[in-house]
Amino acid sequence: MTETKDLLQDEEFLKIRRLNSAEANKRHSVTYDNVILPQESMEVSPRSSTTSLVEPVESTEGVESTEAERVAGKQEQEEEYPVDAHMQKYLSHLKSKSRSRFHRKDASKYVSFFGDVSFDPRPTLLDSAINVPFQTTFKGPVLEKQLKNLQLTKTKTKATVKTTVKTTEKTDKADAPPGEKLESNFSGIYVFAWMFLGWIAIRCCTDYYASYGSAWNKLEIVQYMTTDLFTIAMLDLAMFLCTFFVVFVHWLVKKRIINWKWTGFVAVSIFELAFIPVTFPIYVYYFDFNWVTRIFLFLHSVVFVMKSHSFAFYNGYLWDIKQELEYSSKQLQKYKESLSPETREILQKSCDFCLFELNYQTKDNDFPNNISCSNFFMFCLFPVLVYQINYPRTSRIRWRYVLEKVCAIIGTIFLMMVTAQFFMHPVAMRCIQFHNTPTFGGWIPATQEWFHLLFDMIPGFTVLYMLTFYMIWDALLNCVAELTRFADRYFYGDWWNCVSFEEFSRIWNVPVHKFLLRHVYHSSMGALHLSKSQATLFTFFLSAVFHEMAMFAIFRRVRGYLFMFQLSQFVWTALSNTKFLRARPQLSNVVFSFGVCSGPSIIMTLYLTL
């Protein structure tokens, strides 16, 4: 089957229009029928193939023979390597993909779709910097010993070597000799900080016991944490089991019952788009859950959707790659002698890239053997949101380390409950009273009271914010990683040293950042053809929407405060990139730390009072 095209609509043949001269012997129309398009023609002008009639226009003399020779030459080349319409469209598709598949500077190097996210055996930050040194190399104070050794070295040097010191010129250099550095271990401060928080919690508990006795079950936070546990567990289990729908879809594709490109893709997309809208009203409105339960179920449902999406579209991409490999290989074998050298090269590159992509993570080519309920279940257990066939694993489970993290989880939850009950709950009740008093004696007293509430909220909420971060991203994720022998423990970076919120958004929650990088940022650039700046804006916008939904799950009302604060990070990023702040990283870190300590408290106070 050949593709027909009116050459008069192609830029290559625009000069032919001048053949229709207004002089004698003019031609009223020039029509070409049944033209076999070469590959170059499809790439330059991929318009629909039709036969048309063009009105005669003015032309110059002497052009007819030149254009006729060119057309004849092209027709001879096309007849030598005929390509059908479907193949022509397929080749055009491959050429459009080549820009993202090959390195810009070296066309022989492939660029994998999976190269944006990597997993390597890495320890978590607090373990490598504090916990491990404290348990393995801690020997008490070391600074005094270093000073004594340094003094002893200087004394021996003076006794053996005579030196001349010039003191006539002043200098600003430090007195310490170059290469000599004093080091100390700060593990003791880490222990002291936890001891300090523990004694505060014990003091609060003893004060409550002296006033109310052993009626611990009457505490509001305790009631929040201990009610409807069975219902919550069953609902969470039901949502988890629903995510196996994506495994069922890919199993159907594996058995060639359906095709991923159309049926599978649409089915998974509908499932993901409907998952949160269907489950959200159940735990927010249908069940009379407290706000702690609502936010837990919402965040867990988002995790389920993210894991399902990563599993589904990772394997969906490999289905497309596998199908491309089969088709390109088939065409190379079928038309081995009749294809042009350029077409043969395109198809061969397609086969090479597909093999490279299928073997990118493992030489065993486990796809599609990885599509199973057990594989998806194991992925759901891993403390990661981006799916791939293989992950770095440890050789064994360190049960002492697991016990340490379990104790850290229990102890941190206890500290969080004490902080929430005795430091935040009274302020929250005052905020609700403020919200229920519309006038509050005028706007000036109301403003003063609002700032008073904010200042009371900041200390307790900042402590709760830090404890929540430690409990989830260090204690909980490391405990799960150890139980599953997941070797990459890089769940967060040193975000406390950030000088901009742009850095903070990347390293404070590495699992979510990796998911957004692959499945939102890069996918939006590929599927929606967005630029880098547009993809960045789209990623932040989507993240802000889910943050606002989390606030709705807690307060059951839409205010948009957190949504606006999320998007305001663009402003803070622009300010941190100014020449003034870039030259002063210490000041930038102070500004960042002020925002981290005050921002969450401002948002919480706004939602409670306004």
Swiss-Prot record:
It comes from the Eukaryota. One of its GO terms (molecular function) is lanosterol O-acyltransferase activity. It is a multi-pass membrane protein. Residues 67-76 have a biased composition (Basic and acidic residues). A motif (FYXDWWN motif) lies at residues 491-497. Residues 41-81 are annotated as: Disordered. This is Sterol O-acyltransferase 1. It comes from Saccharomyces cerevisiae (strain ATCC 204508 / S288c).
